[in-house]
Regions:
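An N-terminal assembly and electron-transfer interface module characteristic of large anaerobic redox
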Residues: 1-417
C-alpha cells in the first residue's frame, strides 16, 4: 500500500451525496442511546439505534468476526449485521457508524474488524463511519460526515448530564420500590421527554425536566430494607451495556444490593487531566491556543455539571461523586497518571472514591483478554488494598463463551461474606 495505491479492501465511503442515508448505530446503554438519534438529527443526520444487544448479537458477531478481538467489538458487529439482515433497509440508502477514541487497546481496531465482518456477511456496499469528538483522532474520515460540534455542544452536554443523573435515581429507586415497574415507568417517561427537548435544542429545559424528575422519583413508595452497596467499575461498554455485562447489575439487585455506577461523564472529563499530565511529562506538545481554551472548556463543563448536581442533591438517595481532578488526586496515590490506556488511572480513582465513601464491595469488569484494563485494574489490586484494607475487590472477565453460573458463584463470594 502506497499513497498512489491506497487500501481498497473496503470500497464503500460516505460522501456528501450520502447525507440522506439512514445511519445504523449499535445499542450502547439504556440512559444515553435513546437520546443519540435526536442529537444526530440536530446535526443533520438520521441515526437509528439497533435493538438492544442480545444473544443473537453475540452469535452473529462471532460468526462474521474474530473471537480474538475485544468482546464489545463482537457485540457491536453482531448488532449491526443482525439489523441489516432483517431486510428493513435499502442497502443503497443505509450506512453504519461506531464511536472511536483512538486509545491504545484493541478497541482502536474496531473499524477494520467491523469492515471485514460486514464484508464477510455480504454488506461490503454499506459505508462505515467513525464518530469521534476530535482530540486528534483521525480514523476513517469520510467527506460526507462532519459533526457540527458547536451546534450540538450545549444540548449534547446537558443530555449526557441528564442521562447520568436519571440513571443514578433509577438505580437507587428500582431496588427499593414497593410497586414493581413504577421506577421503570418514570425512567422511560423522562427519557422520552428528554428526547423531545433535545430535538427542540433547548438545553435549559433539560434542567427544568431534571427538577421534575427528582420530584417524581422521590414520590415512589419504597420498602424500608437493608441493602448492601456494591460499586461497579471497569471497561466502558461492559459497564453500561446490560447484555455486555451479562446482566450483573440485575443479578445484584435481585440479591438485595444497590449497584453504584460512576457517571459516564467521568470517562470523557478525564481527558482534561490527561492533557495536563502529558504536557507536564513531555509526552505530548500542547499549542498555546489549546492551553488557553482547555481551562475555559473545563470550567464551562464543570459549571454545567454542578447545575445538574444541585438539582440531584434533592433526591432521596443522592450519591455524591467527586470532580475528575479530585479522582485524579486519589488515583495518583496508587499509580502514575501517565497510565492512560484502557480506562487508565480512572479505575484507581473510582475505587478510591468508593472506598472513601464506605463502599468497599466493588466489582471490576472488563472484556476477556483486555490487557490494557488488566494492567490498570487487577494490576493495582495489591496497592489498592494497601491504601484501603477493607476493600473487597472482584475482577471479572466477560466473554461470549463464559459460564454464567461461574460468574454468579464468584459474585456470591463478594456479597455473602
Amino acid at each position: 500500500m502506497t499513497p498512489e495505491q491506497p487500501y481498497i479492501g473496503y470500497k464503500s465511503t460516505f460522501g456528501k451525496k450520502d447525507k440522506h442515508r439512514i445511519v445504523l448505530i449499535p445499542w450502547f446503554t439504556d440512559f444515553l442511546s435513546p437520546l443519540i438519534p435526536a442529537l444526530a438529527q440536530l446535526a443533520g443526520y438520521k441515526f437509528v439505534n439497533c435493538p438492544k444487544t442480545s444473544k443473537t448479537s453475540a452469535e452473529i458477531g462471532l460468526r462474521y468476526g474474530n473471537n480474538e478481538v475485544c468482546y464489545p467489538a463482537t457485540l457491536v458487529l453482531g448488532d449491526l449485521i443482525a439489523e441489516l439482515q432483517t431486510g428493513k433497509y435499502d442497502l443503497d440508502n443505509v450506512a453504519v457508524a461506531i464511536t472511536q477514541t483512538g486509545g491504545q487497546c484493541r478497541a482502536t481496531n474496531y473499524l477494520g474488524m467491523i469492515k471485514q465482518g460486514l464484508k464477510n456477511a455480504g454488506f461490503e456496499c454499506v459505508p462505515t463511519i467513525a464518530v469521534t469528538l476530535g482530540g486528534g483522532v483521525h480514523q476513517n474520515e469520510q467527506k460526507g460526515f462532519k459533526l457540527p460540534i458547536m451546534k450540538i455542544l450545549n444540548i449534547g452536554v446537558n443530555a449526557l448530564f441528564f442521562g447520568d443523573a436519571l440513571f443514578q435515581m433509577f438505580s437507587a429507586a428500582i431496588v427499593r420500590e414497593k410497586s414493581t415497574g413504577e421506577t421503570q415507568k418514570f425512567f422511560d417517561f423522562y427519557l422520552e421527554k428528554a428526547k423531545e427537548i433535545t430535538l427542540e435544542n433547548k438545553p435549559q429545559k433539560l434542567l427544568s425536566l431534571m427538577e421534575q424528575a427528582v420530584n417524581d422519583f422521590n414520590s415512589i413508595e419504597i420498602v424500608d430494607k437493608k441493602l448492601q452497596k456494591v460499586g461497579l467499575i471497569g471497561e466502558i461498554f461492559v459497564k453500561y451495556n446490560n447484555y455486555g455485562q451479562v446482566h450483573i447489575t440485575e443479578w445484584l439487585r435481585a440479591h438485595n444490593c444497590e449497584v453504584l455506577v460512576p457517571p459516564m461523564t467521568s470517562f470523557f472529563l478525564q481527558s482534561f487531566v490527561n492533557q495536563q499530565i502529558n504536557r507536564e511529562n513531555g509526552i505530548k506538545r500542547t499549542n498555546i491556543l489549546t492551553l488557553k481554551l482547555l481551562p475555559l472548556l473545563y470550567k464551562f463543563l464543570d459549571k454545567r455539571q454542578k447545575k445538574f448536581e444541585k438539582r440531584l442533591e434533592k433526591s432521596h438517595f443522592f450519591h455524591p461523586h467527586e470532580s475528575i481532578f479530585k479522582l485524579a488526586q486519589y488515583a495518583k496515590e496508587i499509580l502514575d497518571l501517565s497510565n492512560q490506556f484502557g480506562e487508565g488511572w480512572l479505575i484507581a480513582g473510582e475505587v478510591a472514591n468508593f472506598a472513601r465513601q464506605g463502599v468497599n464491595r466493588i466489582v471490576c469488569i472488563q472484556p476477556f483478554g483486555c490487557i490494557a484494563n488488566h494492567i490498570v485494574a487487577k494490576g493495582i489490586e495489591r496497592r489498592l488494598k494497601q491504601h484501603y484494607p477493607d476493600l473487597n475487590l472482584l475482577f471479572l472477565d466477560i466473554d461470549g463463551g463464559m459460564a454464567e453460573v461461574n460468574l454468579h458463584n464468584r459474585l456470591h463470594f463478594l456479597i455473602d461474606e
